[in-house]
Curated annotation (Swiss-Prot):
Protein role: Catalyzes the oxidation of either pyridoxine 5'-phosphate (PNP) or pyridoxamine 5'-phosphate (PMP) into pyridoxal 5'-phosphate (PLP).
Gene that encodes the chain: pdxH
Protein's name in the database: Pyridoxine/pyridoxamine 5'-phosphate oxidase
Pfam families cross-referenced by the UniProt entry: PNP_phzG_C, PNPOx_N
Reactions catalysed, as given in the entry: pyridoxamine 5'-phosphate + O2 + H2O = pyridoxal 5'-phosphate + H2O2 + NH4(+); pyridoxine 5'-phosphate + O2 = pyridoxal 5'-phosphate + H2O2
Organism: Nitrobacter winogradskyi (strain ATCC 25391 / DSM 10237 / CIP 104748 / NCIMB 11846 / Nb-255)
Record lineage: Bacteria, Pseudomonadati, Pseudomonadota, Alphaproteobacteria, Hyphomicrobiales
Length: 213
């Protein structure tokens, strides 16, 4: 393996010492803002890890569609693989990786469904074609052919040719409420910075720990 990529200039890394942060939400917000300014594609993309009832893990990329002190929100079909797994085991982990900044953030915690009002409000902001696609798709189910999918899309488009497209009853969102954050920043020669924030419950203060790289 070629390790020349390990030799990086300090000026490439960060502005300010993130290890001095006292709580994780403001730090994440600051890093996300920098990623939004510098990351060429989807700075809100995150890897979502779930596990089924047998404990077998699963992983996929999704888009974060909301973030505040309550947690991170994403949307999908309730009957999708992720939806079924979260119903059986309502815990998850997230990973944000911003290559242009040489940073990543890990998040772990329990998952709860968003309210119908939240799901309705977000669905109303989606492009019309995406709304129609949500009706046509049976996410994670076997599909006979691309043509069959396009025919289903055309059928739903005709059905909702006039007026607003309502949210499908089987389409909603989830919120992962963090009990753990880890902020990782690349440093030369693999001497990285890692800061972990943990709490045992939502009403317990955060404990910050610096970790060996």
């Amino acid at each position: 393996m070629n390790d020349t990529t390990d030799i990086k200039h300090t000026s490439q890394l960060t502005s300010g010492d993130f290890t001095e942060a006292r709580e994780p939400f403001a730090l994440f917000e600051a890093w996300l803002a920098e990623a939004t300014a510098s990351e060429p594609n989807d700075p809100d993309a995150m890897a979502l890890a779930t596990a089924d009832a047998d404990g077998l893990p699963d992983l996929r990329m999704v888009l974060m569609k909301g973030f505040d002190a309550r947690g991170f929100v994403f949307y999908s079909h309730i009957a999708s693989a992720k939806g079924r797994e979260l119903a059986a085991n309502p815990k998850a982990a997230l990973l944000f990786h911003w290559k242009s900044l040489r940073r990543q953030v890990r998040v772990r915690g329990p998952v709860t469904p968003v309210t119908d009002a939240e799901a309705d409000a977000y669905f109303a902001t989606r492009p019309r074609q995406a709304q129609i696609g949500a009706w046509a798709s049976r996410q994670s189910r076997p599909l006979e052919s691309r043509l069959a999918f396009e025919q289903a899309i055309a059928k739903e488009a005709a059905k909702y040719a006039i007026g607003a497209v309502p949210r499908p009853p089987g389409w909603s969102g989830w919120r992962i409420t963090p009990l753990q954050f880890e902020f990782w920043h690349d440093r030369p020669f693999r001497l990285h910075d890692r800061i972990e924030f943990r709490r045992s419950a939502l009403d317990v203060p955060w404990t910050k720990t610096r970790l060996y790289p």
